[in-house]
Regions:
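A cytosolic small-molecule/anion-sensing beta-strand core signal
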Residues: 63, 111, 220
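All-alpha effector-binding/dimerization core of bacterial HTH-type transcriptional repressors
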Residues: 81-126, 153-154, 163, 184-187
């Protein structure tokens, strides 16, 4: 009696295995043997899947190095980023932060020497701020602006300090001397957040953190803002990890991963 042919993997199973190969390579696995061990699939099947992925440009093979992610994934990544605007991706996270804090929430991107506001969720405490969606404010005097500058150097920081004035003339007296401004920016850059201590509007304080994309580049910043009575220094310090967590969640939507999750290529 002729033995029945072995059942072939279903389309869903094949897809899942193909994705497992891609994820394995993305995690730093470079040779076929290690990919097999990582995903728990026979060598012949893994080789067939990897060959198909190379042919379709989802993977590529570099001599002396092994498998790497292919150009098709780069193309799809950029397409995915363009298909869904940043503000749309960020909105659920901003709304959650607004509910938790009761304060005004901002999302901004850099536009030259200014912070351009993409989103604003007003707070529940009855105060009104000058910020508006589509408006610009100087980078060096806003919390989101400083957060957008955290990867810059000191020459850029000083250039931005002199590039714009606070939106309120009454806040002009709060402008810091160059060295004090640099000291603060150094501290902010080391810690990954920024404060607005009434630098732009009297009595308005802000806690901000940068948003990064898959390349770890700062592409936006998120902030929580309120008046001094609602935002004493103790609360500002307490808000830092909360705002950073929201910024990290938005960054994750853009493909960013924490440094500890980045694996070195296998040698």
């Amino acid at each position: 009696m002729t033995a029945a042919p072995a059942p072939t993997a279903s389309g869903t199973q094949t897809l899942a295995r193909g994705l497992a190969v891609i994820h394995s390579v993305a995690a730093g696995t470079r040779d076929l043997r290690d990919i097999c061990a990582r995903i728990g699939v026979a060598r012949s099947t893994t080789h067939r899947l990897a060959s198909c992925l190379v042919q379709e440009r989802y993977l590529r093979v570099l001599p002396g190095y092994g498998y790497t992610l292919g150009p098709r994934l780069i193309e799809l990544g950029f397409q995915a980023r363009e298909d869904i605007p940043l503000a749309t991706l960020a909105r659920p996270h901003l709304e959650e932060l607004a509910r938790a804090s009761g304060d005004t929430i901002h999302l901004a991107v850099r536009d030259g020497a200014d912070a351009l506001y993409l989103e604003k969720i007003p707070g529940k405490k009855g105060l009104e701020m000058r910020s508006r969606v589509g408006h610009r404010m100087p980078l060096a005097v806003t919390g989101v602006g400083k957060a957008l500058l955290l990867d810059g150097d000191e020459l850029e920081w000083l250039a931005m300090l002199h590039a714009g004035a606070p939106v309120s003339p009454r806040a002009a007296g709060n402008t810091l001397p160059e060295e004090r401004f640099l000291d603060r920016m150094r501290d902010y850059a080391r810690a990954g957040y920024a404060f607005d201590l009434e630098d732009n509007e009297p009595s308005i304080r802000c806690v901000a953190a940068p948003v990064r994309d898959a390349s770890r580049t700062i592409v936006a910043a998120v902030s929580v803002s309120s008046t001094v009575p609602y935002m004493p220094m103790e609360r500002m310090r307490d808000m830092v990890p909360i705002v950073q967590e929201v910024a990290a969640a938005i960054s994750g939507e853009l493909g960013w991963r924490p440094a500890t999750a980045q694996r070195r290529p296998a040698r």
